[in-house]
Swiss-Prot record:
Enzyme Commission number(s) from the entry: 4.4.1.21
Keywords recorded for this protein, A-Z: Autoinducer synthesis, Iron, Lyase, Metal-binding, Quorum sensing
Catalytic activity: S-(5-deoxy-D-ribos-5-yl)-L-homocysteine = (S)-4,5-dihydroxypentane-2,3-dione + L-homocysteine
Cofactor needs: Fe cation
Cofactor detail note: Binds 1 Fe cation per subunit.
The organism's place on the tree of life at top rank: Bacteria
Assembly and interaction partners: Homodimer.
Protein name: S-ribosylhomocysteine lyase
Source organism of this protein record: Lactobacillus delbrueckii subsp. bulgaricus (strain ATCC 11842 / DSM 20081 / BCRC 10696 / JCM 1002 / NBRC 13953 / NCIMB 11778 / NCTC 12712 / WDCM 00102 / Lb 14)
GO molecular function: iron ion binding; S-ribosylhomocysteine lyase activity
NCBIfam families linked to this entry: PRK02260.2-4 (NF002606), PRK02260.3-1 (NF002608)
Gene3D superfamilies: S-ribosylhomocysteinase (LuxS) (3.30.1360.80)
Function (record text): Involved in the synthesis of autoinducer 2 (AI-2) which is secreted by bacteria and is used to communicate both the cell density and the metabolic potential of the environment. The regulation of gene expression in response to changes in cell density is called quorum sensing. Catalyzes the transformation of S-ribosylhomocysteine (RHC) to homocysteine (HC) and 4,5-dihydroxy-2,3-pentadione (DPD).
Residues annotated for Fe cation binding in this entry: H54, H58, C124
C-alpha cells in the first residue's frame, strides 16, 4: 500500500489548534495545488462530535472561500480533529490560519441557523446530523486557545 503523509505524522508531537502545510503538488501544466492540515483539537485527546463537525464543515465551505482565494475543498478528517483544506496555488500557513480564525469567529459570533448552508434533505446526505450549538461551542473553545501557524511550536496568529 502507498504511504499516506498524514499517517506518517507523529500525532504526539503536534500542538493543536494549528495550520500545517502538508504538501504542494504541481500538475503537468505547472498548476499548483496546496494541501493543508487544519487541526482544531489535539489528536487522541478529544474529537468534535459529528453534529458540530458537520455544521462547521458546511460553514467553512463558504466562509473560507470568502476569505481565501482558490479554495477547492475543505473536508473533515475521519478522526474528527480537523479538516483537510485543498487550494489552488500557494498560501502561507499564516494566511490560512487567519482565514480559519476569522471563519471560526464568524461561526461563533454571527451565524444563525438560517445561515447554515445545506441543511435540507435535498442538499445534504445526512441533513439530520447538524448542531449549530455544538459548532459554536467548539469554535469558542478553539478560539480561546488560538490558531497557530506552526504545528509543533505555538505561534498564535494575531490580527
Amino acid at each position: 500500500m502507498a504511504k499516506v503523509e498524514s499517517f506518517e505524522l507523529d500525532h504526539t508531537k503536534v500542538k493543536a489548534p494549528y495550520v500545517r502545510l502538508i504538501t504542494v503538488e504541481e500538475g503537468p501544466k505547472g498548476d499548483k495545488i496546496s494541501n493543508f492540515d487544519l487541526r482544531l483539537v489535539q489528536p487522541n485527546e478529544n474529537a468534535i462530535p459529528t453534529g458540530g463537525l458537520h455544521t462547521i464543515e458546511h460553514l467553512l465551505a463558504s466562509l473560507l472561500r470568502d476569505r481565501l482565494d482558490g479554495v477547492i475543498d475543505c473536508s473533515p478528517f475521519g478522526c474528527r480533529t480537523g479538516f483537510h483544506l485543498i487550494t489552488w496555488g500557494e498560501h502561507s500557513t499564516t494566511e490560512v490560519a487567519k482565514a480559519l480564525r476569522d471563519s471560526l469567529k464568524a461561526i461563533r459570533d454571527d451565524i444563525t441557523w438560517e445561515d447554515v448552508p445545506g441543511t435540507t434533505i435535498e442538499s445534504c446526505g445526512n441533513y439530520r446530523d447538524h448542531s449549530l450549538f455544538s459548532a459554536q461551542e467548539w469554535c469558542n473553545d478553539i478560539l480561546k486557545k488560538g490558531i497557530s501557524d506552526d504545528p509543533f511550536d505555538r505561534h498564535v496568529v494575531e490580527d
